[in-house]
Amino acid sequence: MRVVHVASEVFPFSRSGGLGDVLAALPAEQARLGANVTVVSPWYATLSGTPQEVWRGEVPGLGPVGVGELRASGVRFLFVSLPAFERPGLYHPDDVERFCAFGRAVLPVLQALGAVPDVLHGHDWQAGLVVAHAHLAGWRTAFTIHNLQYQGRWNLAEARTWTGLPDWTFSPEGVEFYGDLNLMKAGLVFAEQVTTVSPTYAREITTPQYGEGLEGVLIRLALEGRLSGILNGLDQDRWNPRTDPDIRPYADPAGKAANGSVLRAEFGLDDAPILGVVSRLANQKGIDLLIEALPELVERWNVVVLGGGDPLLTAALHGWAYHPRVAFVSGLNEALAHRIYAGADAFAMPSRFEPCGLSQMIALRYGTLPIVRETGGLVDTVPGDVGFRFADATTEALATACRDARTTLEDVVEWQSRMKRGMELDFSWEGSARHYLALYRHLCSVN
């Protein structure tokens, strides 16, 4: 089985969030299971690693295009070099135009390298145009929604010349969306099978509350049997409390306490239990609810927050950092994230929506009990007899769940029993990888 994944980022070469993590772990597991796997991504100026150039040529409508290659974990990584990506950083305001160029380059590159796959699998809107071109070329295609909120939209009158698509595709049945080009919709419409990253999120996005305006398309896909949810896994080598070099390793609840002491010492916290948060700072993640709940939370918890994003939320958290029970570090810090997962007692994820989420799985693996809103992948991964769940996206609902967790924490036997059950849950990528490979085999068996 020859599989090509296409995505805008892949850890450790380029990463801004969970998408990059998925594109590191899923292809590696598929390769371990015997598939021939290639990942195609842009060759960013700030790429970590030095690919070896394996091809350079002209692509109609784009001009010179180069391709670099790296290999790791049994996977071939191809990086497409285009002028639009020769600048610092991953994402920019003109990304629709940039990823249209990328989308037009991928098929000619794969053809030139003799790497035409059995199935091309695109991820999120940045790969939507690739899926459209692959489908029109007669290739088997799958497409995964990682976050429906981001759709890659631009005024169609300006953007249509960027795509290389035939005129008939610029319609409401195709890639047009209220006068815009919509690259997420391109992936949905032209993929033979569409997946998203948890079963609950697959159901949620067929409703107006979560469908981001595309629920009509998604309802049709569901009725046609073309929409499903496959839960993401967790890289259990990278996130392993037994071997993690950034913490004091431990294998059971009893060994966790030393990491709490380290975290308290690092931030000058008292002996109150620690509520951890590692998150992008956005209203989607419910960080505004967390901030509104802080006056009550600090009565019974130390609160340690790591994350970057929305300037207003960042400023609000900086305003709380004076409090002796609040610690806030702005930005990304991988080692500190590991210390928070290991040192906190509980972990808050009050997301308004969460397609899958990785943080709650990491927290469970580290014996840190999640306090989560019942949405998306949080429903599918946090059992009610392990973590603490609440239904409404309100400050009061979050505060109530945190009160319940704090009360339960007083029962040492119950708390450690929950920790043990959480640490024993299996979030390995093997099950997810097998589900995707079965989906590919189904695609290849259909005439």
Swiss-Prot record:
Pathway, per record: Glycan biosynthesis; glycogen biosynthesis
Single GO BP term: glycogen biosynthetic process
Alphabetized Pfam families for the sequence: Glyco_trans_1_4 (PF13692), Glyco_transf_5 (PF08323)
Catalytic reaction(s) noted: [(1->4)-alpha-D-glucosyl](n) + ADP-alpha-D-glucose = [(1->4)-alpha-D-glucosyl](n+1) + ADP + H(+)
Recorded superkingdom: Bacteria
Gene Ontology molecular functions: alpha-1,4-glucan glucosyltransferase (ADP-glucose donor) activity; alpha-1,4-glucan glucosyltransferase (UDP-glucose donor) activity
Isomerase listed as a keyword: no
UniProt-listed CDD domains: GT5_Glycogen_synthase_DULL1-like
The keyword Transferase is assigned to this record: yes
Family indicated by similarity: Belongs to the glycosyltransferase 1 family. Bacterial/plant glycogen synthase subfamily.
Known role: Synthesizes alpha-1,4-glucan chains using ADP-glucose.
Protein name: Glycogen synthase
